[in-house]
């Protein structure tokens, strides 16, 4: 067996007296991919921040050995010079700069006199992308011209330009399509063959199984186990992550479905940058009291834009007729929607769901502050009671209610956003990608909440790119393709293949006579 490239022993990290890491061990060998698994808040990101120099030497206890020698890093620059490079879940690219400029950001090739040698950077950027077998990216174009999948590959090229020996990938596929994810996994396999080591952090255990040689599981800041992937099952990894076995991820129980509560008619949304293009084209649907409506479709199909239009949050021009309990609504903003009894947990919680500078508690009560106001003053005690009750209800983990929400894990941020929306007492709750970047334990909690709300008579609209999630939750499935309704199915024996087949159809294609109908 080859000597370890990296050895971390007994890593301890405190935040204001709260132990985020409590004696964590991690070993990585050249050309090995180690899966780092744990629930949200388990300490995965904190451990990687220690390793990558975000938390410099001296701010934590323990030992790190790199290539057989102690690693003493005062910052990210030191670890990158050593060959340790992290690619964060939120990509660190400058949209307005070219691909080549992003790849060399902070490591520019310069001419005598200090001017950038742009031609040399373009040549080297081409070489790096060729090494990754990528030919669909023009290095002279701005990064903003490319989607999430290509941007992830640009980040990997940027890491290789820093001569990475160990690549840390933090939730690398959270915003990728299935095809883009497969391409990413192929590149990870290729990097392993070239001797580059990887630490792969993902809640998608099928990806961990596909590329990882070893799995290290941590829970509540402690090391649980390190085992070869071949000796593990998905069920065993989950049990180690959460400390218990999750037998039924979708605890479906009978619930009564009542009358139509929300009806959307002829929803049309125009593209923000190209108003002649329609992102949503004349879509109509309804949802009943106590019903869980799943909304499926390919990435870019217009699902999010449709939900934003109903919630009064679409940034471009749109037209729609929205009725609540048979009465027309005039929704011009999210505040109008909330007053009408419609709440929404957005797809991008960091941009649209939280105020990062505020504490967890103040984020939770942001939509209902008037409830605690008397003569212009907030009843702080009543507000705190509501915050604590909400956090307890959804098991939001935070050292104290007014810790900045930006410091929470993704899963706890998501549960805080859910808590905020539930405080509005909605009749209709829209959940757009509710479990993106969320661990399996938090997923199970969110699913239990969805079914509990349905039993209480709340109408739920769940938008998800995970077809297993749609089929596990929904009573009925609406399929959107190219901004149009491609199918509306009762979830009784419905399959993923049927949903995908519907998503790939356009209205024009459906209108054409088939060979069977022509005979």
Curated annotation (Swiss-Prot):
Q: Which InterPro entries match?
A: AAA+_ATPase, ABC_carbohydrate_import_ATPase, ABC_transporter-like_ATP-bd, ABC_transptr_XylG, P-loop_NTPase
> What EC number(s) is this enzyme filed under?
7.5.2.10
One Pfam short name: ABC_tran
Q: Summarize where ATP binds, as residue positions.
A: 38-45
Which intervals hold domain ABC transporter? 6-245, 262-507
Q: List the disulfide bonds.
A: none
Q: What's its catalytic activity?
A: D-xylose(out) + ATP + H2O = D-xylose(in) + ADP + phosphate + H(+)
The record's section on PROSITE patterns has: ABC_TRANSPORTER_2, XYLG
What keywords are assigned to this protein?
Answer: ATP-binding, Cell inner membrane, Cell membrane, Membrane, Nucleotide-binding, Repeat, Sugar transport, Translocase, Transport
Compartments it resides in: Cell inner membrane
Give the GO cellular component terms, alphabetically. Answer: plasma membrane
| GO-annotated molecular function | ABC-type D-xylose transporter activity; ATP binding; ATP hydrolysis activity
DNA repair as a keyword?
A: no
Q: Where is the signal peptide?
A: none
Annotated family: Belongs to the ABC transporter superfamily. Xylose importer (TC 3.A.1.2.4) family.
- Assembly, per entry: The complex is composed of two ATP-binding proteins (XylG), two transmembrane proteins (XylH) and a solute-binding protein (XylF).
Which protein are we looking at? Xylose import ATP-binding protein XylG
Q: Which organism is it from?
A: Burkholderia thailandensis (strain ATCC 700388 / DSM 13276 / CCUG 48851 / CIP 106301 / E264)
């Amino acid at each position: 067996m080859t000597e370890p490239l990296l050895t971390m022993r007994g890593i301890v990290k405190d935040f204001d007296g709260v132990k985020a890491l409590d004696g964590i061990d991690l070993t990585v060998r050249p050309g090995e991919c180690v899966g780092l698994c744990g629930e949200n808040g388990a300490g995965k990101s904190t451990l990687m921040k220690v390793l990558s120099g975000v938390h410099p030497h001296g701010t934590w206890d323990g030992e790190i050995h790199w290539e057989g020698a102690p690693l003493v890093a005062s910052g990210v620059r030191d670890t990158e010079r050593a060959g340790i490079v992290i690619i964060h879940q939120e990509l660190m690219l400058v949209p307005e700069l070219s691909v080549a400029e992003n790849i060399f950001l902070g490591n520019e090739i310069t001419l005598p006199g200090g001017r950038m040698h742009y031609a040399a950077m373009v040549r080297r950027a081409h070489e790096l992308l060729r090494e990754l077998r990528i030919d669909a990216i023009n290095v002279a174009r701005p990064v903003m011209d490319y989607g999430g999948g290509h941007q992830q590959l640009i980040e990997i090229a940027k890491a290789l330009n820093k001569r990475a020996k160990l690549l840390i990938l933090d939730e690398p596929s959270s915003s990728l399509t299935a095809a883009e994810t497969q391409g990413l996994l192929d590149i990870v396999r290729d990097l392993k063959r070239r001797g580059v080591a990887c630490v792969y952090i993902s809640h998608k255990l099928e990806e961990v199984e596909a590329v990882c040689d070893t799995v290290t599981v941590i829970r509540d800041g402690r090391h649980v186990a390190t085992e070869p992937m071949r000796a593990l099952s998905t069920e065993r990894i989950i049990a180690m992550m959460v400390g218990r076995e999750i037998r039924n991820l979708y605890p479906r129980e009978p619930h009564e479905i009542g009358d139509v509560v929300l009806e959307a008619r002829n929803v049309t949304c125009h593209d923000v940058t190209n108003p002649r293009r329609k992102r949503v084209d004349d879509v109509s649907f309804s949802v009943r009291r106590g019903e869980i409506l799943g909304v499926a479709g390919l990435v870019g199909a217009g699902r999010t834009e449709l939900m934003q239009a109903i919630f009064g949050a679409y940034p471009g021009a749109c037209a729609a007729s929205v009725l609540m309990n048979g009465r027309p609504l005039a929704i011009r903003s999210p505040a109008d929607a909330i007053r009408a009894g419609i709440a929404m947990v957005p797809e991008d919680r960091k941009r649209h769901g939280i105020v990062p500078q505020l504490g967890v508690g103040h984020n939770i009560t942001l939509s209902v502050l008037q409830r605690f106001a008397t003569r212009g003053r907030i009843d702080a005690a009543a507000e705190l009671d509501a915050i604590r009750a909400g956090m307890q209800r959804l098991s939001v983990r935070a050292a104290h209610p007014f810790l900045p929400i930006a410091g929470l894990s993704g899963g706890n941020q998501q549960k805080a956003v859910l808590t905020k929306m539930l405080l509005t007492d909605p009749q209709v709750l829209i959940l757009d990608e509710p479990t993106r970047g969320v661990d399996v334990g938090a997923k199970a909690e969110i699913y239990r909440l969805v079914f509990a709300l349905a039993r209480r008579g709340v109408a739920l609209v769940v938008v998800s790119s995970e077809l297993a999630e749609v089929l596990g939750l929904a009573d009925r499935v609406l399929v959107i393709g190219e901004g149009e309704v491609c199918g509306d199915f009762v979830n009784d024996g419905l399959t993923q293949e049927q949903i995908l087949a519907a998503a790939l159809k356009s209205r024009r294609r459906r209108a054409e006579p088939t060979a069977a109908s022509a005979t």
